[in-house]
Amino acid sequence: MLFLRLLPLILCFSGLVHAEHRVFTRKDGFLSMRDKLNVYFFRSDTHRLLVRDEGSVKTPRYGSLDKAMRKSPCVAGVNGGFFSADAEGTPLGLVVQDGKRLSPLATGSFAVSGVVYEGGRDGLTLVRSSVLRRMRRLPAMQAAIQGGPFLVENGSAVKGLNAQKSTYRTFIATDGGRRWCIGVSSSLTLKELAAWLAAPGALGNFRVATALNLDGGSSSAFWCHETGISYPAFKQVRNYLGVAPVERR
């Protein structure tokens, strides 16, 4: 009986769990507020990314992350990339949904410094936008979202990140191999979040090699089917990034 209760924990620390939701907290000082991360871990050999685009923020196709995920084969999801303040909420940067490019690759802003994409031969990949910009032709993509800035690169927190503005944050990260996670944070500066993600043991046995910031603030949203948790955005966003099991043929 005790073994059955401990089995999920044993599997977690042995690295056999393919996907799970976990919450991490910390306090910097006795009088400080408790910081929190809601994180969904998954493996790129058992799960894939899906993009769900609203089409317009004025007349959205879904209306919320929760509805978008429930109408898809997703087990977890977060809000996606940045978008403009016009009536349609035009995406800022590359958006690919089900193999169709909805918005082109953008450059010249920290908000579009990186791209996470689900490709055919390449699998799940997180790269700098400049790498794709130098290509004569973009690789095949089934799903893609552009965001920024990078929070962690080569296992270290990126230097020069904003240390003044605190707000909710959304991110995607990888250990450099097949282990990935999506997550949202409580109100933090970019510098604080980067330092937290890069700290050894911050996400248990998941060591962050690269992490990319997505749209945050009032756009931040998190949804997990397994635990029934749904943290909606405070405003209508343009697109979402979901995690779904790989389709076996």
Regions found by a protein language model. Give the residues of each.
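Sec-dependent signal peptide recognition
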Residues: M1-L9
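Gly/Ser/Thr/Pro-rich low-complexity, intrinsically disordered segments
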Residues: L16-R249
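Repetitive helical segments and hydrophobic/amphipathic motifs
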Residues: L11-S14
